[in-house]
Amino acid sequence: VDEWYINMDWRKKIKKIVDEINWIPEWGQEREHEWLDNMGDWMISKKRFWGLALPIWIFEDESYYVVGSKEELKELAVEGWDEFEGNSPHRPWIDKVKIKHPESGLIGKRVEDVGNPWLDAGIVPFSTLKYNTDKEYWNEWFPAEFVVESFPGQFRNWFYSLLAMSAMLEEKAPFKNLLGHALVKAEDGRD
């Protein structure tokens, strides 16, 4: 199955902001560094219907174009904008938009893939704290003061996606303090 990946040649940026965080317990910092040192490229796509629509359009010559904003999408759109406008940027509305490649002039359609859920999780601060629309509000609430989460799995999932997005977009940590705990179980020992 073909998937989409982000080349992680910028992991040093992520490692730098890992060191800005107060990790409780302290070994969490080392664990995150180990993950970053040993990870491959980041698979960002899934073969699903619902999810974060990847902003990638593909053309008949198999070239592709990544659209950088809603404004750019509107500018490039040659079909389907009226059906899309006013709806959320998800399927089926986003898939109605066809664009003209700014260099080749070919008409393309969006790839059917959606984003990996952890890619989506990494942009939560950006999508909920008005990153694109109210910088004063954004600066008041970002970075978060405190995150509490179970350690198992989150080093390569939620923490990683938050760190990656923040490193790329803001070049600073998405939270100041992280309290990690073991898996919490029910009284009878079930997860």
Language-model-detected regions and their locations in the chain:
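Structured secondary-structure scaffolds
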Residues: V1-D191
